[in-house]
């Protein structure tokens, strides 16, 4: 036998190579182009290797997708999710009503809390359940929650179930009604053939025919109809709500030959609305009293009824407000944030014989006026401050009380009875109230203008106790290093519900220069200095005020004064995360401080040292942690 040829030997080697590598994920190749599209080619010197990519299996020359979902332990989908195989990988899919959360698997989606996910009716309440949600119609309404409407008799006092679009809703018929303005409904109009077969629902009569139904039997062949319909009963007063009456039709000598049930309500504007139904026969139509055309009592207040006198309608005080004893005169007191308002009811004053009302406070320059917001009252207003209008301030440890006296007369001169009404408003002491009632608090203030939301004022003050209700007063404070400083910042004006006051950097310097390179940070980058155990941040970025405390200290070296500075920021709670997240022992370098947003307070002098306030130079040296003295400061910021 001769020697095997080189070609035959090469074929054997190649075949052996394929057999050896077929069972592995890696194969040697001559060129990278021989590798499968889902393989990675590696060239190492003279060897070219094909390796299947992650998620695929094969020898590199041929790679097929690995189904991780079918192999135990090959995927990390949670038990409540489904594994879906994808080319080279897999994905975990949650069932409807759930969302994939890292580390938690599939968690329930609260469709009620996220806009656009629930499709409940506007009146319905969304109730979240695991994997879905429910829609519940309110009490008195019927429906499946995706559609809700009221049912007759289910609405509250003074309300009725009325059409609104394609649904029925509970509403006040004084606002939800249609109008009838036909002049021929007047009882003075002659015969005709009108028939109210199409009337159903709440209506108000307006126009030249009259504003209310006739209350007496109407002669036949009037109101442009054959058998006129009139209201068999009196109209209700506004405090009676919705009442039921009978409308009678006059024909053939009978004032009530036919009848229909109607409902009537007296409205605050001095008019009436009627829930009418189609009459039982034709030709029948509802008639109006022509005397109600003029003087329709549109100006009647809620304390008055619309009454007819000699064919003319006018406003008349309700019987409930008639009093004969001055001691029964009621007054309404409103204690506002900045002023106090005391009011007396006009109807009660009229019943006591006050045709004219002269009312004033201890300072007679503060006199009464007709309340524009409520025609039933005459009012007088005084600022909630000590002094204006004769207002007197008294305070204790918990409250500040402003008091004054209201004087009442029916003439500009008084000979006999001098009527006095003492009134007072008490306000719980907080940072704002305590500063307002202090004679000369140490305060720093800053004005801030935020585009579209108005002007804000930020104040900073130093308080004596952890209640933050006793501010230090005067231009400077002297304290020992054993004392604690209680520092409060507060925001006034503008939309306080939207913005939170955030103290970004609060620090002390030995001089009045806020840019002094020697700084001791109490709050830095929104977080307290954790190396000082005496620092306590009570509130920051949570509301319209901020509070922190620290033990008094002094700077090492020849420094006896401490000045406090706070950089503040108005945080938009609708678009920003305002409350700082602070944890661990960190003390960062911080960002550049915006001096236009810095409140400055001081000096605070170490007890036993005579203060020299005129020093304003920058100071270099070491800080010895004793603890800082603080005064109140006020700052004004402008944001464009």
Swiss-Prot record:
SMART domains: EGF, EGF_CA, ZP
Key word rRNA-binding present: no
Main location: membrane
Protein's recorded name: Uromodulin
Prosegment location in residue numbers: 615-640
Disease cited in the entry: Tubulointerstitial kidney disease, autosomal dominant 1: A form of autosomal dominant tubulointerstitial kidney disease, a genetically heterogeneous disorder characterized by slowly progressive loss of kidney function, bland urinary sediment, hyperuricemia, absent or mildly increased albuminuria, lack of severe hypertension during the early stages, and normal or small kidneys on ultrasound.
Region of interest: ZP-N: 334-429
Location of the ZP domain: 334-589
GO cellular component: apical plasma membrane; basolateral plasma membrane; cell surface; ciliary membrane; cilium; endoplasmic reticulum; extracellular exosome; extracellular space
Keywords attached to this entry: Cell membrane, Cell projection, Ciliopathy, Cilium, Disease variant, Disulfide bond, EGF-like domain, Glycoprotein, GPI-anchor, Immunity, Innate immunity, Lipoprotein, Membrane, Nephronophthisis, Repeat, Secreted, Signal
Region (Flexible ZP-N/ZP-C linker): 430-453
Site keyed Cleavage: positions: 587-588
Glycosylated residues, chain numbering: 38, 76, 80, 232, 275, 322, 396, 513
Keyword Cell membrane appears in the UniProt entry: yes
EGF-like domain span: 28-64, 65-107, 108-149, 292-323
Effect recorded for residue 435 to S: Impairs polymerization and filament formation of the secreted form
Cysteine disulfide links: 32-41, 35-50, 52-63, 69-83, 77-92, 94-106, 112-126, 120-135, 137-148, 150-161, 155-170, 174-267, 195-282, 217-255, 223-287, 248-256, 297-306, 300-315, 317-347, 335-425, 366-389, 506-566, 527-582, 571-578
Region (D10C): 172-291
UniProt effect for mutating residue 458 to R: Leads to retention in the endoplasmic reticulum, probably due to misfolding
Outcome when changing residue 217 to R: In ADTKD1; results in defective trafficking of mutant protein to the plasma membrane; the mutant is retained in the ER
GO MF annotation list: calcium ion binding; IgG binding
Source organism (scientific name): Homo sapiens (Human)
Mutagenesis / variant outcome for changing residue 109 to E: In ADTKD1; causes a delay in protein export to the plasma membrane due to a longer retention time in the ER
Sequence segments annotated as region (Beta hairpin): 150-171
Chain spans, region ZP-C: 454-589
Region feature (External hydrophobic patch (EHP)): 598-606
Domains as described in the record: The ZP domain mediates polymerization, leading to the formation of long filaments. The core of the filament consists of interlocked ZP domains which assemble into a helical structure. Each ZP domain consists of an N-terminal (ZP-N) and C-terminal (ZP-C) region connected by a flexible linker; the linker allows the ZP domain to wrap around the ZP-C subdomain of the preceding subunit. The heavily glycosylated N-terminal part of the protein (containing several EGF-like domains) forms branches which protrude from the core and are involved in pathogen capture.
């Amino acid at each position: 036998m001769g020697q095997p040829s080189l070609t035959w030997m090469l074929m054997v080697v190649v075949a052996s190579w394929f057999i050896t590598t077929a069972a592995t994920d890696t194969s040697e190749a001559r060129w990278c182009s021989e590798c499968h599209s889902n393989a990675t080619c590696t060239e190492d010197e003279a060897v070219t290797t094909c390796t299947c990519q992650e998620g695929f299996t094969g020898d590199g020359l041929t790679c097929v997708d690995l189904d991780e979902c079918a192999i135990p332990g090959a995927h990390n989908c949670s038990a409540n999710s489904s594994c879906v195989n994808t080319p080279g990988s897999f994905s975990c899919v949650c069932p409807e009503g759930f969302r994939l959360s890292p580390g938690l698997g599939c968690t329930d989606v609260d469709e009620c809390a996220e806009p656009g996910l629930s499709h409940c009716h506007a009146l319905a309440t969304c109730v979240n359940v695991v994997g879905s949600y429910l829609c519940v119609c309110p009490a008195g309404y019927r429906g499946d929650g995706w559609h809700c409407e009221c049912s007759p008799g289910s609405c509250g006092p003074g309300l009725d179930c009325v059409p609104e679009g394609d649904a029925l809703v509970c509403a006040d018929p004084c606002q939800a009604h249609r109008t009838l303005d036909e002049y021929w409904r007047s009882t003075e109009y002659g015969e005709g053939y009108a028939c109210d077969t199409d009337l159903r629902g709440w209506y108000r009569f307006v126009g030249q025919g009259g504003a209310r139904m006739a209350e007496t039997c109407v002669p036949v062949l009037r109101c442009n109809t054959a058998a006129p319909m009139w209201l068999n009963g009196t109209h209700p007063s506004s405090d009676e709500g919705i009442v039921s009456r009978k409308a009678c039709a006059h024909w053939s000598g009978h004032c009530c030959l036919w009848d229909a049930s109607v409902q009537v309500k007296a409205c605050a504007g001095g008019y009436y609305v009627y829930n009418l139904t189609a009459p039982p026969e034709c030709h029948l139509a509802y008639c109006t009293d022509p005397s109600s055309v003029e003087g329709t009592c549109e100006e009647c207040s809620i304390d008055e009824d619309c009454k007819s006198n000699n064919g003319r309608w006018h406003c008349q005080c309700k019987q409930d407000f008639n009093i004969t004893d001055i001691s029964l005169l009621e007054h309404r007191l409103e204690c506002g944030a900045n002023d106090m308002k005391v009011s007396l009811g006009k109807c009660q004053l009229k019943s006591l014989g006050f045709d004219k009302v002269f009312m004033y406070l201890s300072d007679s320059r503060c006199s009464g006026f007709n309340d524009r917001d409520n025609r039933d009252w005459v009012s007088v207003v005084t600022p909630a401050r000590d002094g204006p209008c004769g207002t007197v301030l008294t305070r204790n440890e918990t409250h500040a009380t402003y008091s004054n006296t209201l004087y009442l007369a029916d003439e500009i001169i008084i000979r006999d009875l001098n009527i006095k009404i003492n009134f007072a408003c008490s306000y719980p002491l907080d940072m704002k109230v305590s500063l307002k009632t202090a004679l000369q608090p140490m305060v720093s203030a800053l004005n801030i203008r935020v585009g579209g939301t108005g002007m804000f004022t930020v104040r900073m003050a130093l308080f004596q106790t952890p209640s933050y209700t006793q501010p230090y007063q005067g231009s400077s404070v002297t304290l020992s290093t054993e004392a604690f400083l209680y520092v409060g910042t507060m925001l006034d004006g503008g939309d306080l519900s939207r913005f939170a006051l955030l103290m970004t950097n609060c620090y002390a310097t030995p001089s009045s220069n806020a840019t002094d390179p020697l700084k001791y940070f109490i709050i830095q980058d929104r977080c307290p200095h954790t190396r000082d155990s005496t620092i306590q941040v009570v509130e920051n970025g949570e509301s319209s005020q901020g509070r922190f405390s620290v033990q008094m200290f002094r700077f090492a070296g020849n420094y006896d004064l401490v000045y406090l500075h706070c950089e503040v920021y108005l945080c938009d709670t609708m678009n920003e995360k305002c409350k700082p997240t602070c944890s661990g022992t960190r003390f960062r370098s911080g960002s550049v401080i915006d001096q236009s947003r810095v409140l400055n307070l001081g000096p605070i002098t170490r007890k036993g040292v005579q203060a020299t306030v005129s020093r304003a130079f920058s100071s270099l040296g070491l800080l010895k942690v004793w603890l800082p003295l603080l005064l109140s400061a006020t700052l004004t910021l402008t944001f464009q």
